[in-house]
Amino acid sequence: MNEQIITILAEDGTKTSKIRKLLLLGLTHREIANLVTRGNRGFVWNVYKRMRDEGLIVSAGTPTATTTPELDYSFRRKFGVEIEAYNCTCQRLVRELTEAGIEVASERYNHDLRPHWKLVTDSSLNGNDTFELVSPILEGEDGLEKLERVCWVLDSCNVKINGSCGLHVHMNAEDFNITTWRNLLLSYKHAEAEIDKFMPASRRGGSNTYCGSLIQFPDERIRSARNIRELQGLFPSRYMKVNLQAYSRHRTVEFRQHSGTSVLQK
């Protein structure tokens, strides 16, 4: 590997700064994604687009009829996360996150949407100094960068994860139609056995009270649903691997199967 590339990868800077330098070296988006973002080409595309808009990179020009148009991998969707963990007091977390420039408040357990990160208690968690850290609405690459900063703080506070902890991800679903919902549920259901293979035992199958399996629901019942309300009636609990009840409150779909983590790449 080129010595310049090795030096850049070894730097303490952010992924964004490394991507910018590698782009200036002339590496392809795919090469950079494999080196820096574990294959996430959307992240690289966003950095490239920003550099191009700033005039730091000259685009190859207008595509001709024989040129393959450049695909837009940019990530713009709104999302939110809930991180469950233990081994750090809320007081310390508030202090450390605030010092890192993250607006955060410690609150009683609630489902209210806030413009800031909130720390709440959760009776389902085991361990000392348990907590759930809930994000405000995040969006696109900027949201991922904020999440990266939060994960860095959690790591510096030596937070820990056990089998009772989960990572819940909300994705904006305001633009979903019934076909999107059906396809999402059927795809997840049919892939669930494979997804289980890279999840810890505590979050596989239907053994976890807080992330129930979709496998038990017949395909024909999903396909015959005419709207989101009928699908919510089929999946009435929010404690499912794919939670449809979140749509009524937040206009999101919530993915609940992932095990707890403070590692951004996961």
Q: PLM features: what roles do these ranges have?
A:
Residues 80, 120-125, 181-261:
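Aromatic/basic-lined ligand-recognition segments
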Residues 53-157, 244:
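Terminal catalytic/cofactor-binding subdomain
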Residues 5, 30, 34-49:
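Short, basic interhelical loop/turn and adjoining N-cap
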Residues 25-34, 165-168:
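Short, charged amphipathic recognition helices of the HTH superfamily
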Residues 87, 137-141, 173-177, 259-263:
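A generic structural motif
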Residues 130, 160-176, 252-256:
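Histidine-centered divalent-metal-coordination microenvironment in nucleic-acid enzymes
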Residues 1-8:
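Short, Lys/Arg-enriched N-terminal segment that forms or immediately precedes the first helix
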Residues 10-27:
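Short, amphipathic alpha-helical "recognition" segments used to contact nucleic acids or chromatin
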